[in-house]
């Protein structure tokens, strides 16, 4: 078989949704707002491809450092480096204390 290198390769189980959570996404997830410095989890929403971060950042936690259009800038720690991930709010969830 040919080797394919698309952005969603190796995500067969990582991006799979629960049977009860399938269907249309609530509007509140699309229009949610975050504050600067707020902790958020990057959880990719597989039904919406636009504004989805790379699969290596799925499950990471970071802090919001800014906004770029409709997307949010999230700073995460990757080893000893800090990286900035651009993601739409559908793929972010606020951390609950």
Swiss-Prot record:
Q: Give any single GO term for biological process.
A: translation
InterPro entries in the cross-refs: Ribosomal_eL21 (IPR001147), Ribosomal_eL21_arc (IPR022856), Ribosomal_eL21_CS (IPR018259), Ribosomal_eL21_sf (IPR036948), Translation_prot_SH3-like_sf (IPR008991)
What UniProt keywords apply to this chain's record, in alphabetical order? Ribonucleoprotein, Ribosomal protein
User: PANTHER family attached here?
Assistant: 60S RIBOSOMAL PROTEIN L21
Asked whether the keyword Ribonucleoprotein is assigned, the reply is yes
GO CC field: ribonucleoprotein complex; ribosome
Name of the protein in question: Large ribosomal subunit protein eL21
The family classification in the record reads: Belongs to the eukaryotic ribosomal protein eL21 family.
Q: Does the keyword Coiled coil apply?
A: no
Q: Where are the transmembrane segments?
A: none
List the source organism. Methanospirillum hungatei JF-1 (strain ATCC 27890 / DSM 864 / NBRC 100397 / JF-1)
> Gene3D superfamilies this protein is in?
Ribosomal protein L21
The opening ranks of the lineage are: Archaea, Methanobacteriati, Methanobacteriota, Stenosarchaea group, Methanomicrobia
């Amino acid at each position: 078989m040919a080797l394919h290198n698309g952005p969603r390769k190796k995500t067969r189980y990582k991006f799979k949704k629960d049977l009860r959570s399938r269907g249309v996404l609530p509007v509140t997830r699309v229009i949610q707002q975050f504050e600067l410095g707020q902790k958020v989890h990057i959880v990719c929403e597989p039904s919406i491809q636009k504004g989805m971060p790379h699969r290596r950042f799925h499950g990471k936690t970071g802090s919001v450092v800014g906004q770029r259009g409709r997307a949010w800038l999230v700073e995460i720690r990757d080893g000893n480096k800090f990286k900035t991930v651009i993601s739409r709010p559908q793929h972010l969830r606020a951390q609950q204390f």
